[in-house]
UniProtKB/Swiss-Prot annotation:
Residues 1-19 form the signal peptide. Probably modulates blood feeding of fleas on vertebrate species by binding and sequestering different mediators involved in the host response. Binds histamine. Binds leukotriene C4. Does not bind serotonin, adrenaline, noradrenaline, leukotriene B4, leukotriene D4, leukotriene E4, ADP, and stable analogs of thromboxane A2: U-46619 and cTXA2. Lipids and biogenic amines bind independently through different binding pockets. It is found in: Secreted. InterPro entries: His_Pase_clade-2, His_PPase_superfam. GO terms for molecular function: phosphatase activity. It holds the Pfam family His_Phos_2. This is Acid phosphatase-like protein XcAP-3. Keywords: Disulfide bond, Secreted, Signal. Coiled coil: none annotated.
Length: 380
């Protein structure tokens, strides 16, 4: 009898403990919606279509709308939200491209369950509200004129040179069809693969020569090159993701102190940040949130497993229990992939915020530090 009573008491304590811990805030970072194939800055000229002339595809719109629906199903009840409202309890933000801004607003429409916004013609003012000045800084590391140190550091990594050699024959085959392709540039391998992948869906007759085996190899190389370029050294982590890490850690600190996420439209009532980024910036964010020793569902992740496909998201959940805060990271590789928990080295799945900060802060840099580091080398 005493044993039974003791068991009930233990279960009651566990239930009370679980009930006391509440999800308070979520950062959702989304890869932007699929768009009409075009030439991408930094890559080869394959389509001769400028990115500014490229619009979201119908499939892309559907993917991010359904993603918004999924995010609502995951978090609406847990966050205590009765109705999603971008002026009150969630903040849709994006990088400065028009496509990304429209993408984040359509994801927000899915969050709200408002189909009428899926094909809405958004005004310039509505799009402008999704961005703020720091967005321009997050992405500058991919510009050799603004951040030569990144390109210099990448060029000095033997593993990157080896990977380029590993897919040289495939890139030479592509070069037969598109002369501007440079097989010696990591960014050309990545952006060539992403462009051909879109063409195989949107303009298949133009790339019949690109076999499935070739595409598989180019994806493998693209994933590996991106991961090496953002994680191989501490300097690469700081240059690629250090600014966005610094910004998020600052936001999290404000939230743990009962303050609003800076710039958020809903102030302290805001519960969710919905950030739409290009694929490369999502990779850079993963790089700083997955330091050496981090695991993905208990395993050391491969570059292929963290390469963001269409509908990829990274969710940063913040829990609070009587003033004690914890953080949980979840990554979805794409729209049809299950969520996998990112566990930091030496931490539980729900990592105490102070410990979370201590593990990651070495990669965080402010704008001045980033500027100085970017300019600390010449390229080429």
């Amino acid at each position: 009898m005493k044993a039974t009573i003791l068991l009930f008491l233990v279960l009651a304590v566990v239930q009370l403990s679980t009930a006391a811990e509440q999800l308070k805030f979520v950062f959702v970072t989304v890869r932007g919606a699929d768009y009409e194939v075009c030439d991408i800055p930094g890559g080869p000229k394959i389509t001769n279509k400028d990115g500014k002339d490229s619009k979201l595809t119908e499939e892309g719109k559907n993917t991010v709308y359904q993603l918004g629906v999924k995010v609502s199903e995951l978090y609406k009840s847990k966050l205590g939200v009765s109705k999603w409202d971008s002026s009150k309890n969630y903040w849709p933000i994006a990088t400065n491209s028009r496509r990304s801004q429209i993408s984040t607003l359509i994801t927000g429409a899915g969050l709200e369950g408002d189909q009428s916004k899926r094909d809405k013609s958004w005004t310039d003012e509505e799009l402008k509200k999704t961005s703020f000045p720091a967005m321009l800084q997050f992405w500058k590391f991919i510009d050799p004129a603004k951040c030569p140190k990144f390109f210099k550091e990448v060029s000095q990594q033997p593993e990157i040179a080896t990977t380029l050699q590993d897919c040289a024959s495939q890139m030479q085959e592509v070069k037969k069809h598109y002369d501007t392709v440079d097989p010696t540039k990591p960014q050309h391998v990545w952006l060539t693969y992403e462009t051909l992948k879109k063409m195989k869906k949107q303009q298949p007759s133009k790339v019949e020569w690109a076999s499935d085996d070739m595409m598989k190899k180019l994806r493998e190389c693209s994933a590996k090159l991106n991961w090496l370029a953002t994680t191989k050294t501490d300097t690469l982590r700081k240059l690629s993701g250090g600014l966005i890490l610094s910004d998020i850690l600052n936001d999290m600190k404000e939230i743990t102190q009962g303050k609003a996420q800076p710039h958020a439209t809903g102030g302290t009532s805001n519960k969710l940040s919905l950030f739409t980024t290009p694929q490369g910036l999502l990779i850079a964010k993963l790089a700083v949130f997955m330091p050496p020793g981090a695991t993905l569902d208990g395993k050391v992740p491969t570059s292929s497993e963290v390469y963001p496909e269409s509908g990829a998201t990274m969710n940063t959940e913040m829990y609070e229990d009587n003033g004690t805060w914890k953080v949980k990271l979840i990554y979805y590789e794409g729209k049809d992939y299950p969520g996998k928990t990112i566990k930091l080295p030496g931490c539980e799945e729900k990592c105490p915020f102070q410990q979370f900060q201590q593990i990651l802060t070495k990669y965080a840099v402010n704008e001045q530090e980033h500027e100085t580091l970017c300019k600390s080398a010449q390229w080429p």
